[in-house]
Amino acid sequence: DEPDGVPTRQKQ
């Protein structure tokens, strides 16, 4: 899980 702030993948 990527930390909120680094939009590497669109979280839906």
Curated annotation (Swiss-Prot):
Origin: domain of life: Eukaryota
Gene Ontology cellular component list: extracellular space
Tissues of expression: Hemolymph.
Assigned protein family: Belongs to the tyrosinase family. Hemocyanin subfamily.
Quaternary data: Hexamer.
Task performed by this protein: Does not function as a hemocyanin.
Protein name: Pseudohemocyanin
Species in which this protein is naturally found: Liocarcinus marmoreus
